[in-house]
C-alpha cells in the first residue's frame, strides 16, 4: 500500500558552485531508488528557497518548521532525508544540524564529522594523529601575510593550492614555482576564506567507496583515475577528460591495504552512510606502495557515471539495494 511506504526526500542543490552538479546527483538517485518500496521526492535547496520539484515541472514550497510540503491540499511529511548536497550546506554539517533539530533521520554522518571532513586542513591533521599518511600542508586565512619563498621551501614544488573547505576541485591550482602562488591563492580565495597549500604527491590517484550498516561492511572496488589534465580538476571530473578504471590496477597486497585503510578511516570518523575516500598511491624510499589519504567525500556524486555507481556495479551489487540498506539502517 502507498501509505505503508517510507517517504524520502532527496535533498540536492545547495549554495555552492556545485549546485548544478548536486542536482544531477539528485536526479541520479531518483532513478536508482526502489519506488516500489519508497515514495521519493526531489527537494531543491538554495539559500532560503527550499522546494519540492515534481516530475511535471511544478514545485511546492518546503515548510522549514518541519520539512513538510502540501500536495493536493494535504500535508506530506518525510520519514528520511537522503542528502546529496555537494558543498554548503550539506557537506559542512549545517543541513545535518537542521535535521537533528527536527528529529528527521538522514543519510550522512553527523554535524561534527561533516564539518571536519569538509575542512581539508583540519581533516588531514586529525587523521595524521591516527597514523594515516597525508601530505604536508599549510593553512592561510584571507588577509594573512605570507612569504612565497618560505612556503616553497617548507612544502616544496610543485604543490597544490586549494580552498580548505570546498569540493569538486573548484578553485584548485597546481603550482610549479613560487611566482605562481599569488594568482593561485586569489583563485582559491574566491571559493573559501581559508586556503590550504598542500605538498604534491607523485603517484596513482584512486578513489574508494564504503558503507557500513549494523549487519555488514561493504568496501567497494577502488577506481583508478587517469587524466591527461595536470590533475583531476573540475573539467576532468565532469566533462569527461579522464579515464576511470574500476577496479583499479593495484597489486593484491596494495588493494587490501587500501581497503583496510578505508574501513579504518570510516571507523575513526564514526562515519555514516556511503562515503568515498580519495588516495594517492606513491612509492616509499624502498620502492614499495604507500597509501596516502587525499580527501574524503561524505556526499559523493551519484550520477549514473559517478564513481560510486561504477563501483557498485563492479562489485556485482544493485544500487537500488545499496540505497535501501543505507535507509533501513536508520530504522
Language-model features, listed with the residues they occupy:
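ATP-dependent carboxylate activation and anion-phosphoryl transfer catalytic cores
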Residues: 2-6, 131, 252-331
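Hydrophobic beta-strand scaffold residues
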Residues: 40, 105-106, 134, 159, ...
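Active-site nucleotide/adenylate-binding loops and adjacent lid/helix of ATP-dependent enzymes
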Residues: 2-12, 16, 24, 116-204
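Short Gly/Pro-enriched turn/cap motifs at secondary-structure boundaries
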Residues: 88, 163-164, 199-200, 266-271
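Phosphate-binding site of ATP-dependent enzymes
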Residues: 176-260, 283-292
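ATP-binding N-terminal substructure of ATP-dependent carboxylate-amine bond-forming enzymes
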Residues: 1-107, 111-112, 116-118, 122, ...
Amino acid at each position: 500500500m502507498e501509505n505503508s511506504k517510507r517517504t524520502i526526500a532527496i535533498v540536492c542543490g545547495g549554495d555552492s558552485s556545485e549546485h548544478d552538479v548536486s542536482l544531477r546527483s539528485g536526479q541520479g538517485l531518483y532513478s536508482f531508488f526502489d519506488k516500489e518500496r519508497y515514495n521519493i521526492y526531489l527537494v531543491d535547496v538554495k539559500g532560503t528557497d527550499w522546494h519540492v520539484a515534481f516530475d511535471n515541472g511544478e514545485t511546492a514550497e518546503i515548510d522549514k518548521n518541519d520539512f513538510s510540503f502540501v500536495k493536493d491540499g494535504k500535508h506530506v511529511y518525510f520519514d528520511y532525508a537522503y542528502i546529496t548536497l555537494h558543498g554548503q550546506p550539506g557537506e559542512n554539517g549545517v543541513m545535518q544540524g537542521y535535521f537533528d533539530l527536527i528529529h528527521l533521520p538522514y543519510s550522512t554522518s553527523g554535524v561534527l564529522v561533516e564539518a571536519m571532513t569538509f575542512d581539508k586542513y583540519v581533516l588531514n591533521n586529525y587523521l595524521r594523529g591516527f597514523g594515516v599518511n597525508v601530505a604536508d600542508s599549510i593553512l592561510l586565512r584571507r588577509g594573512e601575510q605570507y612569504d612565497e619563498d618560505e612556503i616553497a621551501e617548507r612544502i616544496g614544488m610543485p604543490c597544490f593550492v586549494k580552498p580548505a573547505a570546498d569540493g569538486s576541485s573548484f578553485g584548485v591550482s597546481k603550482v610549479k614555482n613560487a611566482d605562481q602562488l599569488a594568482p593561485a591563492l586569489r583563485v582559491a580565495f574566491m571559493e573559501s576564506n581559508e586556503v590550504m597549500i598542500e605538498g604534491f604527491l607523485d603517484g596513482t590517484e584512486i578513489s574508494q567507496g564504503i558503507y557500513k550498516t549494523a549487519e555488514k561492511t561493504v568496501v567497494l572496488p577502488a577506481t583508478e583515475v587517469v587524466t591527461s589534465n595536470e590533475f583531476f580538476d573540475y573539467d576532468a571530473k565532469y566533462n569527461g577528460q579522464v579515464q576511470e578504471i574500476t577496479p583499479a590496477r593495484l597489486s593484491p597486497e596494495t588493494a587490501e591495504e587500501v581497503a583496510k585503510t578505508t574501513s579504518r578511516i570510516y571507523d575513526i570518523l564514526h562515519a555514516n552512510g556511503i562515503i568515498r575516500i580519495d588516495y594517492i598511491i606513491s612509492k616509499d624510499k624502498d620502492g614499495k606502495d604507500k597509501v596516502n589519504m587525499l580527501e574524503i567525500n561524505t556526499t559523493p556524486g551519484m550520477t549514473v557515471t559517478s564513481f560510486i555507481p561504477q563501483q557498485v556495479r563492479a562489485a556485482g551489487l544493485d544500487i537500488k539495494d545499496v540505497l535501501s540498506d543505507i535507509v533501513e539502517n536508520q530504522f
